[in-house]
């Protein structure tokens, strides 16, 4: 079995391969369980890990919520593991693996919650830079001190990073959803305009009805 271990604090990730005698100790554990890494080997002694997922030998992913070692065929929708939704609202019945670890699991995904005293090469002794920045314009402005009168937030931040980073490869990717936010704002304004128009029409109809049958406004 292979272990895909990640350390989110440092942004590192590394693949390990364990022996059969250590692999057996992981059997019957399920997604979300925490354990001492000492059962996997001396290099992980004192490290607290958590199981986050995995794949079997045929590539079917483990899914939490199904307490079984076997495969199941639940009805999946958009956002569920093991199903990529192509059309809006379409649900499919797909095969996925249960959340309990068994001998049929090929790769197991783990994260380090608390490192031990020993340094793990490539995980706890290394730090990877952030690859993406916040997507919200408000957070970007606060992080880099972008003035309110500045309209091109992405360009302003990119100029700051270029002046600070000698190597352009180290500049993190800037994801900005300003266009999407603008479209959402336009959509909300359009909906509000339609509602106000409907309300105005209803008020006029009510007024005409009262004048016609009750002679009062």
UniProtKB/Swiss-Prot annotation:
GO molecular function term, any single one: structural constituent of ribosome
GO cellular component annotations of the record: ribonucleoprotein complex; ribosome
Keywords linked to the UniProt accession: Phosphoprotein, Ribonucleoprotein, Ribosomal protein
InterPro entries assigned to the protein according to its UniProt record, in alphabetical order: Ribosomal_eS6, Ribosomal_eS6-like, Ribosomal_eS6_CS
Post-translational modification comment from the UniProt entry: Phosphorylated.
Biological processes annotated in GO: translation
Family according to the record: Belongs to the eukaryotic ribosomal protein eS6 family.
Protein known as: Small ribosomal subunit protein eS6
Organism, as annotated: Encephalitozoon cuniculi (strain GB-M1)
Lineage: Eukaryota, Fungi, Fungi incertae sedis, Microsporidia, Unikaryonidae
């Amino acid at each position: 079995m292979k272990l895909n271990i990640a350390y989110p604090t440092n942004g590192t990730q590394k693949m390990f391969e364990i022996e059969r005698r250590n692999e057996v100790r992981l059997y019957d554990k399920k997604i979300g369980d925490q354990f001492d890494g000492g059962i996997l080997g001396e290099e992980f002694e004192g490290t607290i890990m958590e199981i986050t997922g995995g794949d079997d030998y045929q590539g079917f992913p483990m899914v939490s919520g199904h307490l079984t070692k076997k495969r199941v065929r639940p009805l999946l929708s958009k956002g569920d593991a093991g199903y990529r939704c192509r059309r809006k609202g379409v649900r499919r019945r797909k095969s996925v693996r249960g959340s309990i670890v068994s001998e049929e699991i090929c790769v197991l995904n783990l994260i380090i919650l608390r490192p031990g005293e020993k340094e793990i090469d490539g995980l706890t002794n290394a730090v990877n830079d952030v690859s993406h920045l916040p997507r919200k314009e408000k957070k970007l402005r606060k992080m880099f001190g972008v003035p309110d009168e500045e309209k091109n937030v992405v360009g302003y931040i990119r100029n700051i990073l270029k002046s600070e980073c000698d190597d352009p490869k180290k500049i993190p990717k800037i994801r900005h959803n300003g266009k999407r936010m603008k479209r959402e704002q336009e959509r909300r304004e359009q909906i509000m305009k339609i509602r106000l128009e409907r309300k105005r029409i209803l008020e006029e109809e009510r007024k005409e009805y009262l004048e016609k049958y009750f002679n009062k406004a």
